[in-house]
UniProtKB/Swiss-Prot annotation:
Residues 272-334 form the SAM domain. One of its GO terms (cellular component) is pi-body. This is Ankyrin repeat, SAM and basic leucine zipper domain-containing protein 1. It comes from Bos taurus (Bovine). The keyword Nuclease does not apply. Residues 1-25 are annotated as: Disordered.
Length: 475
């Protein structure tokens, strides 16, 4: 193999920042035109030549230098070994040669292992997978964490590699371990928006209810990062995928998870997981994948499916068993309606503090659902406006309704602010009353927090409706 220039620098895997990002690997050419060593070299020059042979991928020269006596685990500047560098650029052949020459697959520098470096490499999943297979075959531990307590499976999930995730689990990687911030592999996949990895982790037994240190579940992390498909999928209580592959033996897992279609092109061997749309994600979560073709044939979208009644489902050829699954899921997704008639009359002074607080919590929750619905429309409308049949009604009608909504939300916001001021006034009067016994600080703080949150939510909903109105006006 001819020597060539280095195209990029090797950086520490896992996003760890340090003053050693180049790790002593300089851009340049081999000084010697020949791939053969013409004679013995001094130790320092021999190490420099070894480093340049690694950066250019000159395997024949690497082997010759190893034959001349240089150690395969030679540490270069900042402590990286030749195997760590080869893994960081997903050079499969170089990794194989170094391992065959006795390189330590379990080496780590400041808890940065070779396996972590390989999992966080910038390369195709095919090359990364092959490098990791080689390292695991030499007993690299898939559960050793870095300084931030991130394990290899977390890096693979973060970077969107479902096949790598599956391989690591098949070799004993813990699915639900947490890093220093409480993130699991599933949390990382949800945060980055990798749907295929999320589905694979759920099959492998990932627990979607594990919370981060700030109390967020993977679904909430997905929502915060605007990955609404993943949020909707993870929000479903029913999860037929969970643990589907968990009881398989190691050999069965590897065989099942890495099986590919031999008729596919080589470049697509490791891309067997296609991107799912909204409808596919919903059906997959309910174990109703077999309905996908039927619904697409009848041109039934997810939004249409979510509005269908039981008799409509039956007319479209959906079996009673599948109907039950769909109706149960729809019930979970319904926005809880506030029954204002059940609220005791304030004028009769029969309302309790708990009932009033419960009312505010329900109101706040419903506003949150409405905000999410409007956000979905704002997200989809500019990109998929061709899917909305505007011919059914004039766009001016939509704008007019939006204006009324904004006006109503402004009125609601004004009334909530009045309510907040009134409660604050009553609270101040009670505190100044010498006969009043003050409540615990935590209770008043919590009530105040609920009121503030409700007011902010209502104001935010009004702002979103205003943006929605502008979007319709542009159309």
């Amino acid at each position: 193999m001819a020597a060539g220039p280095l195209r990029g620098l090797a950086v520490a895997g896992g996003g760890e920042s340090s003053d050693s990002e180049d790790d002593g690997w300089e851009i340049g050419y081999l000084d010697r035109k020949s791939q053969k060593l013409k004679g013995p070299l001094p130790v320092e020059e021999r190490q420099e030549t070894f480093k340049k042979a690694l950066t250019t991928g000159n395997i024949s020269l690497v082997e010759e230098l190893l034959d001349s006596g240089i150690s395969v685990d030679t540490s270069f500047q900042y402590g990286w070994t030749s195997l760590m560098y080869a893994a960081s650029v997903s050079n499969v052949e170089l990794v194989r040669v170094l391992l065959d020459r006795g390189a330590n697959a379990s080496f780590d520098k400041d808890k940065q292992t070779v396996l972590i470096t390989a999992c966080s490499a910038r390369g195709s999943e095919e090359k990364i997978l092959k490098c990791i297979e080689l390292l695991l075959s030499r007993n690299a531990d898939p559960n050793v964490a870095c300084r931030r307590l991130m394990t290899p499976i977390m890096y693979a999930a973060r970077d969107g590699h479902p096949q790598v995730v599956a391989l690591l689990v098949a070799h004993g990687a813990e699915v639900n371990t947490q890093d220093e911030n409480g993130y699991t592999a599933l949390t990382w996949a949800a945060r980055q928006g990798h749907k295929n990895v999320v589905l694979k982790l759920l099959e492998l037994g990932a627990n979607k209810m594990i919370q981060t240190k700030d109390g967020k579940t993977p679904s909430e992390i997905a929502k915060r990062n605007k990955h609404l498909e993943i949020f909707n999928f993870l929000s479903l209580t029913l999860n037929p995928l969970e643990g589907k592959l968990h009881q398989l033996t190691k050999e069965e897992s590897i065989c099942k998870l890495l099986r590919t279609d031999s008729d596919k092109e080589k470049d697509h061997i490791f891309s067997s997981y296609t991107a799912f749309g909204d409808l596919e994600i919903f059906l997959h979560g309910l174990g109703l994948e077999h309905m996908t073709d039927l619904l697409k044939e009848r041109e039934i979208t997810l939004r249409h499916l979510l509005t269908m009644r039981k008799d409509e489902l039956a007319k479209n050829g959906i079996t009673s068993r599948d109907q039950q699954k769909i109706m149960a899921a729809l019930k979970e997704l319904e926005v809880e309606e506030i029954k204002f008639g059940e609220l005791p009359e304030v004028a009769k002074l029969e309302i309790s503090g708990d009932e009033f607080l419960n009312f505010l919590l329900k109101l706040n929750k419903q506003c949150g659902h409405l905000i999410t619905a409007v956000q979905n429309i704002i997200t989809e409308l500019p990109v998929n406006s061709h899917k909305i049949v505007l011919e059914w009604a004039s766009p001016r009608n939509f704008t007019s309704v939006c204006e009324e909504l904004v006006s109503n939300v402004e009125d609601l916001s004004e009334e909530v602010c009045k309510l907040k001021d009134l409660i604050q006034k009553l609270q101040n009067e009670r505190e100044n009353d010498p006969t009043h016994i003050p409540l615990m600080e935590e209770v008043s703080t919590w009530n105040s927090r609920i009121l503030k949150r409700t007011a902010i939510t209502v104001c935010g909903f009004g702002f979103l409706l205003f943006i929605c109105k502008l979007a319709f006006q542009r159309k």
